[in-house]
Amino acid sequence: MSLSILIAGASFIGLLTYYIWIWSFWIRKGVKGPRGFPFFGVIHEFQDYENPGLLKLGEWTKEYGPIYGITEGVEKTLIVSNPEFVHEVFVKQFDNFYGRKTNPIQGDPNKNKRAHLVSAQGHRWKRLRTLSSPTFSNKNLRKIMSTVEETVVELMRHLDDASAKGKAVDLLDYYQEFTLDIIGRIAMGQTESLMFRNPMLPKVKGIFKDGRKLPFLVSGIFPIAGTMFREFFMRFPSIQPAFDIMSTVEKALNKRLEQRAADEKAGIEPSGEPQDFIDLFLDARANVDFFEEESALGFAKTEIAKVDKQLTFDEIIGQLFVFLLAGYDTTALSLSYSSYLLARHPEIQKKLQEEVDRECPNPEVTFDQISKLKYMECVVKEALRMYPLASIVHNRKCMKETNVLGVQIEKGTNVQVDTWTLHYDPKVWGEDANEFRPERWESGDELFYAKGGYLPFGMGPRICIGMRLAMMEKKMLLTHILKKYTFETSTQTEIPLKLVGSATTAPRSVMLKLTPRHSN
């Protein structure tokens, strides 16, 4: 027998042993859970667009309880729906759980030059968070209010045309056009509305529909393949939607830099006011005091540090990329679910319309007016409770071995929240947890966050940085629609909604009628 055959045989046995060792991790720990298959674990369960894996978690929770273990290729993941456990991981022990689960195709969060707020961790995440936070301040949100208003007016024109036909329309399609148009104008240098003629829309939709299949599956099982996929897609971005979008972002950034250089050469002074997120990031300076983490002290231990470094070119691309995707999909889905629930509950919709009529009596809607729409905020929060659309990112990676409520968690283990189960837990929400009741939020949401029971935008220090922008967009659009129309179900409305998705959980369609309010 030749030496090469012996080496090949030994390598195969070693590889097989390694994967069986990972696959049997939770068995050896005595932790219950679905086992799946060696090499795969249950990673394939999260690749079926028609049957979202995030909903599968709820089925497993019923079978195995609020804490159980799965393997996803080479990743070991603890699934939890115990609110106290969630609060412990996301808030109290953040210094032990500051990382997030990633796929190798996304790049090493410590080395990837284009790491963004969702993927970055440790010192780099804190720095990016510090530099990006001013972008979503009330001051800057007020600056982009006119852009949001213009985009709302443009969408209303399309909705008016659709409503005039007297037929139900798929509002999900309209909301996706709306959110991509807004994010294109405030984050991509887009100077005019491209609604219903945006060449980027099919690419963005592709990321959420097909972008997580084979490459992510293979990379999750064989991490080295993820590096190879990434290098290939970086070289040929048009092949894969996410890399194609990132290439588009890079072109937009280069165009703005060229414009700035040309203006400077021509002696044109800057206006002093940033046009959009690109300008805000290009001008970003972190010459401010912030709490820098020292690993020797623990991530949450704090020391004042000075940071005087500008965002790099690649970091700006990363931030714009993730803001584009998050700003497009989650806001469109939230609007869709809110509209559907209002159509199903006419009495709640009427109460909301009364608030809109009272607080926003004029055709033009202002920032201060939408800030007073408290019941609308309750409606949106309740819709996000019943349809936690982005729960795939509700996870943390253990960065230092620790014990959480009696469960020993090794470094490198992921903790994924079964958000759908958590958001319907009667111990948190009461016996009416299955009911759409916005009034539960009228006393504030601090109680539900403190219980660890509500995380549509995440929880703790890594909570979604753009949630105020998202709420502003939703309030603005719903205000304009509800001033003029009433949402109604039709024979084409799927009841209950058929849910699909992989990266997010989306309705297949939201077919509703827009009935004019004749009393106006």
Curated annotation (Swiss-Prot):
Q: Which InterPro entries match?
A: Cyt_P450, Cyt_P450_CS, Cyt_P450_E_grp-I, Cyt_P450_sf, Cytochrome_P450_3A
| Record: residues binding heme | C464
Q: Which domain of life is it from?
A: Eukaryota
- Cofactor(s), names only, from the UniProt record: heme
Q: Keywords for this entry?
A: Heme, Iron, Metal-binding, Monooxygenase, Oxidoreductase
Gene3D superfamilies cross-referenced by the UniProt entry: Cytochrome P450 (1.10.630.10)
What Pfam families does the database record attribute to this sequence? p450 (PF00067)
- The record's EC number reads 1.14.-.-
Q: Name one GO molecular function term.
A: monooxygenase activity
Q: What SUPFAM superfamilies does the record tag this protein with? A: Cytochrome P450 (SSF48264)
Check the record and name the PANTHER family matching this protein. CYTOCHROME P450 FAMILY 3 (PTHR24302), FATTY-ACID PEROXYGENASE (PTHR24302:SF15)
Q: Which family does it belong to?
A: Belongs to the cytochrome P450 family.
Q: What does this protein do?
A: Cytochromes P450 are a group of heme-thiolate monooxygenases. They oxidize a variety of structurally unrelated compounds, including steroids, fatty acids, and xenobiotics.
This one is known as: Putative cytochrome P450 CYP13A5
Its gene is cyp-13A5
